[in-house]
């Protein structure tokens, strides 16, 4: 049997469901363990199942503990609400009971006179009381016990009005009135606290009897407050007004015998049932005492000036206490944006990113330092460190009230479609074909300007809006800012290739956003196309097409030849019909939209592509987008034509922004310019506060100072090199550099030129970038300057290790700063006898100097570093060539130049270090 158990297979998704964790996390763990599995539907053996349970059991315990804590908290809240409700009800009963108490002095003489001749009618009058069902039981039980000592209480009641001594009276025994006396004396103990009830008022006695109807648990709870009750009675006796003590003839001595009679055993239940009122009176009594004492102190002062000084001092102390309490509570509240990274959380909570990542591992979440966390994970991590997470954003200050959409304003709107997939699988070709097929007559030259969003019309006349986003990174960035704009995702996969890692990432992002996927299998015109293989791999990745019993629609296409494009559009429209996409087309509703892309035009200023989601955006509308305000100066469609307004799901280019907004920011139309400006300023304050909490950028120059100040624990490094061997050598050398206070941590390494992704990663994790024989592209260089990042370039491994080691020791020599002069592109190569190869070049930017140093870049990788041999223009040697001009260039001792190569000119400038 043991062998059979070992051979038994378990599905990964079933194990994840049993452990209550994400199947993707379990799949990732299994892959890291070396097992060959393709998807969450794959099977594992018993041994691997045991390893999975050992790894993720902590997370299941955490989930169970969290649920248990929530249940206990809810139970405590329920009990507190029930106790407060009971207290209010009993206090109300006491107030109703005490309301008629001033009347007894009027009826008291007749009651005393008639008590002896007609006791039976009084008992009969009490018997039909609505409280009789439960009251007789304790009365009859107490009667035999009281018979020897309680029967003579008929005379103590009458004598209590004249003398406070009940003990000498018990000897005379009037037998006939005994039953009546038991009823009368039984009610008297309830009046121990309130002197009004001492008279034998029948109505008052009957109502007070209701306090007997209490559960045993309540009696026990109130019994614990006995000491406080006795203190309250004593205090009230001292501060009681004369009117309340002289309601009866010789009222004061009358209260004392009642207190002496009660402990003899027949009023115990009612004594406990009455204990709620002293708890209420306690607060009133203590307040009266404080008022009296403070009044005495004030009256004994030297004058109004000292009295005012004391009051001001007390107020200041009270305000200081409140401020201290508020400050302590605010220190434990962490204001953070959703989808924050472990690095940002560490900065806000004053811990290291390593601690955050370790907590995530303990919770079963495998994260990196720059990976964005969801809301639930941030809350759990904050609780682990004793903080309460309060999620904010720069748009949380939005004072715009959401107007409820009326049914009559809702109409069917065009779907918004995003095309995602691997870069080489034909995504761009599909976009180009769809765009070019919708060029109107008269625009035979095609669409010259590129826009991020455009609207096309299908063959049946229905419209579809396409978003041209650069991969799933932009898709995620927009979702991270709360902008859910995409309705449908078209996933492009090449039929002659396979499902690539980027394809799987796109699938995961679409699923996380809850967006349906329409699969487009491209390149079906190629002979090696194998769509069945693609469908199999997609099913392993969690996307099952309709032909195989799934929910995702699939269409085989050829973007190059236009095969299947119309069918793909029809399936997209079918998916949109199933989702019943509606939009508010009312012209009275303030318009809202989402920023898809922004750019800065030299002549027009800031131009942003906006996708309207609600209402109509019109020329002249004041608006707020993120923390940027503006006023619509012009609206243009994707072909540059001016339009007066734009409705839901319609892409439009907007002019009128004061600054560049970010992609994903929500544009909201405001009632006036003043409201828009005030709202933008509030959001700017919040954003500045959040950015202020983050640390400054790490520089290699200032590492030693930060180490001394205790601000630096790890030096994060990103390595980009020309070959994998260089990366391994650099990584091994850097990891060996150790210091007592700091160590080097490589957070990313890769082959190829430095890209924008590397710069963004360095900005998010406060890292420096080391480029070994590679250079950044133009956009990455500009972004690094904007983010103020430290990017360094080397060609010798020893120099890298030496600089980093010296930086850690605070012994950096003066810096040799590289100043970029310009760049040119080789357009043509000429062979010159006795000289070698000469490039016919076009200067792209800057200025090329004859005596400048140059480097030759091919596909972003450095090939040559040296000097210029010749610089000519029209057969003449020149000293410099400006941007936009053509020239001939020869490199010193180097002939291997090709068309498309880029030559960068630079010079070395010495710059003093600042420590």
UniProtKB/Swiss-Prot annotation:
GO cellular component terms attached to this protein's record: cytoplasm
Annotated segments matching region G3: 468-471
Region named G4: 522-525
Region named G2: 446-450
UniProt biased composition (Basic and acidic residues): 83-94, 314-328
Keyword Transmembrane: no
Locations listed in the record: Cytoplasm
Compositional bias per record (Pro residues), positions renumbered to this chain: 165-177
Gene Ontology molecular functions: GTP binding; GTPase activity; translation initiation factor activity
Biased composition (Polar residues): 293-305
Sequence ranges of Low complexity compositional bias: 111-129, 137-164
SUPFAM superfamilies linked to this entry: Initiation factor IF2/eIF5b, domain 3, P-loop containing nucleoside triphosphate hydrolases, Translation proteins
Gene3D superfamilies: 1.10.10.2480, P-loop containing nucleotide triphosphate hydrolases, Translation factors, Translation initiation factor IF- 2, domain 3
Region (Disordered): 83-177, 216-280, 293-328
Residues that hold GTP according to the record: 421-428, 468-472, 522-525
Keyword Protein biosynthesis (UniProt): yes
Family statement drawn from the similarity comment of this UniProt entry: Belongs to the TRAFAC class translation factor GTPase superfamily. Classic translation factor GTPase family. IF-2 subfamily.
Function field: One of the essential components for the initiation of protein synthesis. Protects formylmethionyl-tRNA from spontaneous hydrolysis and promotes its binding to the 30S ribosomal subunits. Also involved in the hydrolysis of GTP during the formation of the 70S ribosomal complex.
Official protein name in the record: Translation initiation factor IF-2
This protein's encoding gene: infB
